[in-house]
A protein has these predicted regions:
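Transmembrane alpha-helix interface motif
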Residues: 1-42, 48-57, 142-145, 149-152, ...
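Membrane-helix interfacial "entry" motifs
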Residues: 14, 37, 60-65, 97, ...
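Transmembrane helix-loop junctions in multipass membrane proteins, especially transporters and channels
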Residues: 41, 45, 60-64, 88-96, ...
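Alpha-helical transmembrane segments and their membrane-interface exit regions
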Residues: 51-61, 75-79
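Juxtamembrane/interface alpha-helical elements of multi-pass membrane proteins
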Residues: 73-187
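Alpha-helical transmembrane segments and their helix-start/interface "positive-inside/aromatic belt" motifs
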Residues: 25-26, 64-74, 246-249
Length: 268
């Protein structure tokens, strides 16, 4: 299950999405997510899904691979779904069972909030799958560069965010290895209820933390050995430049937002 998480992984390729400027991809990803959160009905979500499917097809990534990345988060999505059912108040009851009354508004909010999380994960996964770590760091740094005049550490923050993001699949892979090693020694992670499974995962934490600190130390030593001193006077092999692909991407995303807003007014 852990190996199915796509967030933080990079899928090498030469598609139009891969060749886009990382700054533009970051901006358009944020705009897409904002557009998804503007959606409040089923046709809008179908439109968001169709747009995402088109982008994934252009990138050369299998859409099923992206869907698999949502599966490990199903418990979080289910938890938020149930939370909305219990705590969102409504005026149109569907049925009552003891102290619990399910309303149409609560069900509506639960479904749409769960869909928001799904699109949030899938949208950001497309960004990391089509953008290398170096490009992602450069893109974040260039976007935050104007803040440096206020002594904002743009390069350091961009580096920290990128390393943290790229460590997600590494730590998940390490967790999977430790889990398999402990299962070979008789550990049981699959039987019992949800609470019992959660308790069984506790022995994974100590070796996982040790591995994480070891990897972080190795990375720090490697950066120091290469005389890394931050972003001051840093040169780049390829300078970032906007191209026609970025213009087409911006126009397509703007069209998506316009259609979402128009559809919301017509059906809202």
């Amino acid at each position: 299950m852990l190996k199915d998480i796509t967030l933080g992984q990079y899928f090498p390729g030469d598609s139009a999405i891969h060749r886009m400027d990382p700054r533009m991809k970051l901006i358009l990803t944020i705009v897409y997510i904002v557009g998804v959160f503007m959606v409040s009905n089923l046709p809008g979500y179908l439109l968001a899904l169709a747009f995402l499917y088109l982008v994934v097809r252009i990138s050369g990534i299998k859409f099923s691979y992206l869907v698999k990345g949502v599966k490990p988060l199903r418990f979080i999505i289910l938890f938020t779904f149930v939370l909305n059912l219990f705590f969102v108040q409504g005026e149109t009851p569907i049925f009552s069972l003891g102290f619990f009354t399910l309303t149409k508004e609560a069900l509506h909010n639960a479904i749409f909030f769960a869909l928001h999380l799904v699109f949030l994960v899938m949208g950001t996964s497309v960004l990391t799958l089509t953008t290398s770590p170096v490009q992602l760091t450069d893109g974040l740094e260039r976007l935050m560069h104007p803040l440096q005049r206020f002594h904002f550490p743009a390069h350091e923050l961009a580096m920290m965010m990128t390393i943290a993001l790229r460590f997600i699949p590494t730590l998940l892979e390490e967790t999977d290895k430790i889990q398999k090693a402990q299962m070979a020694r008789g550990a049981d992670f699959e039987s019992g209820n949800l609470l019992a499974r959660a308790k069984a995962m506790i022995p994974l934490l100590v070796p996982l933390f040790v591995s994480a600190f070891r990897r972080a130390n190795d990375l720090a030593m490697a950066m120091e050995a290469r005389c890394y001193r931050g972003g001051d006077h840093r040169t780049r092999l390829r300078e970032l430049r906007y191209t026609r692909l970025d213009v087409f991407g911006a126009l397509a995303t703007a069209a998506f937002i316009a259609v979402v807003m128009l559809e919301g007014r017509l059906l809202g």
